[in-house]
């Protein structure tokens, strides 16, 4: 209805089975299986590892909870898994867990800390905004559809909302919102954010921040008629799935009448977003060359 992609965190040891985790309020519900997870991937959602057992991860269980779980989940969904989501609480964000996440090829880890994420923040401690009917004792704070939105706008932060199973009535009001509350949240994000909202799965956002952090721009030419750049990727981690970037560049006013960009000698349309400012999005690989100018014949040698 709203076009928001979701993200599912999988307890891999119970993939496709009826949930049986301690005294969980969600016991008795069935976990999705591989085919169902593949279906939501085709719908634009994402999938992350929520450990094998949903218990405290010790040094002895790192391989099972992180490596084996990742391998089994990737086989089930026929896609890479780059995100770990801490089960239980931030106990499973301990140093030995995050070190193993890096070792086993994850690109980020999601905590239970209720806070914004900013472009410069550590990607192995991603914060999430809880969408809960109300908080547990002694706080009892009620659901707020505006939670963290205005602060994100002010500080250029990004938000990951999380809930468990938003039905008509929350199964566990300290861990979930209702379906109506989730709809309120979506409506509020769109009304407050307007055209500035980028609705994406975490893998896309992680990829974007990693691409930005590891991109280096080299100026090859900067004349009255042409700007020529080379873009290098410096030590980009292996396995970044999405490799496009959006650029804004200031140019002379005369270049804005019919703006054109050339990426490795291929013409690309650009958009005038403000006076003397062009915007364009392109896939990025190491060493690509970007030319901007008024020459209708393309890049000059």
Each language-model region and where it sits:
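Non-membrane alpha-helical structural segments and their capping/turn regions in soluble enzymes
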Residues: 59-67, 139-142, 176-179, 183
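C-terminal domain-boundary segment and adjacent tail
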Residues: 74, 104-121, 160-239, 249, ...
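Glycan-association/targeting regions that enable binding to alpha-glucans and other polysaccharides
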Residues: 231-233, 240-243, 250, 292-295, ...
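Short beta-strand/loop motifs in extracellular/secreted proteins, especially
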Residues: 245, 257-259, 288
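Short amphipathic alpha-helical segments and helix-helix/interface helices
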Residues: 34-38, 97-101, 148-150, 183-190
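Metal-dependent polysaccharide deacetylase catalytic core of the NodB/CE4 family, i.e.
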Residues: 2-97, 103-107, 112-130, 156-169
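A Trp-anchored, charged/polar loop motif used as the substrate-binding/catalytic surface
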Residues: 31, 133-150
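C-terminal beta-strand-rich structural cap/linker in extracellular carbohydrate-active enzymes
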Residues: 273-301
């Amino acid at each position: 209805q709203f076009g928001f992609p979701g993200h599912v965190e999988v307890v891999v040891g119970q993939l496709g089975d009826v949930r049986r985790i301690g005294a969980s309020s969600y016991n008795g519900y069935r976990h999705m299986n591989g085919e169902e997870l593949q279906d939501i991937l085709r719908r634009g959602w994402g999938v992350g590892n929520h450990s094998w057992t949903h218990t405290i991860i010790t040094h002895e269980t790192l391989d099972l909870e992180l490596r084996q779980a990742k391998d089994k989940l990737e086989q089930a969904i026929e896609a890479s898994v780059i995100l770990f989501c801490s089960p239980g609480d931030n106990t499973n964000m301990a140093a030995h867990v995050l070190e193993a996440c890096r070792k086993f090829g994850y690109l980020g880890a999601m905590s239970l800390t209720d806070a914004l994420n900013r472009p410069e923040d550590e990607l192995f401690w991603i914060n999430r905004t809880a969408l809960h009917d109300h908080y547990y004792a002694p706080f009892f704070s009620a659901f707020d559809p505006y939670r963290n939105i205005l602060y994100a706008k002010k500080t250029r932060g990004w938000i990951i909302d999380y809930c468990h199973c938003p039905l008509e009535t929350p199964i566990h009001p300290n861990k979930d919102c209702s379906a109506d509350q989730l709809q309120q949240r979506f409506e509020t994000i769109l009304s407050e954010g307007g055209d500035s909202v980028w609705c994406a799965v975490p893998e896309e956002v992680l990829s974007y921040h990693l691409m930005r952090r590891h991109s280096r721009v080299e100026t090859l030419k900067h004349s009255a008629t042409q700007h020529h750049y080379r873009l290098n990727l410096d030590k980009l981690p292996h396995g970044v799935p999405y490799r496009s970037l959006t650029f804004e560049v200031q140019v002379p006013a005369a270049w804005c009448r019919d703006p054109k960009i050339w990426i490795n000698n291929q013409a690309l349309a650009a958009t005038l977003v403000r006076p003397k400012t062009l915007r364009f999005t392109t896939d990025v690989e190491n060493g690509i060359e970007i030319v901007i100018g008024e020459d209708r014949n393309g890049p000059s040698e």
